[in-house]
């Protein structure tokens, strides 16, 4: 009788131990299953941004600035359609490649590579010939431009309609800001001015083109340090003309040259003489 009792106890203990082992294994599996998996991507460090000093030391990309493209209107800011076409042709024939502001930003900030002989074509003031003459001419050579919009001009005579602006964005061009009414940044006194000239027009323009507006051209190319600091909150790059660049905000003071009624050959010479390309 005692032997039977001992045998039964032994069997029960064995079953209990076996059950505990199974439970431990199941608990271990559950713990492994519930442990969060760290993806390899999350371990990759964010790319390091260049310092202002490093940005200023980089070779400049030639950036052209056009205003009027029309016949019968002489002045520093005007070129004829024939001259504009000749400019685009010699640039294409000379092996230049147009780049976007996004490419320029990545080059300046992250040292990304650019195509051989890069340059940028920009347009100020929203004039209708930018859509009707400049864009088709550029597209013929595979170029894309940057159109800085003065938003007070929407749908007015001699200026682009909102549909034309939206179409430029759809066709691969970049649409940027040129203020509401061309008031210079140096005259913005308070948050009311910034709301009127930058914040509200930027939001409206973004609804028109259906994408963020990340680039700015200073009215008259004029800036001050305070304005550059404030604009850095809204734009990746802001473009000046021939003024000295800001040592603290080089991205908000990128050089351009006003393109005049000149021969194609002179244009190339001016580009080489003006920009620190090496």
What feature does the model see in each segment?
Residues 134-143, 160-176, 232:
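Acidic (Asp/Glu)-rich catalytic clusters
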Residues 16-19:
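C-terminal motif of bacterial Sec signal peptides marking the signal peptidase cleavage site
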Residues 24-122, 127-129, 182, 186-278:
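C-terminal active-site subregion of NodB/CE4 polysaccharide deacetylases
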Residues 5-14:
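Sec-dependent N-terminal signal peptides
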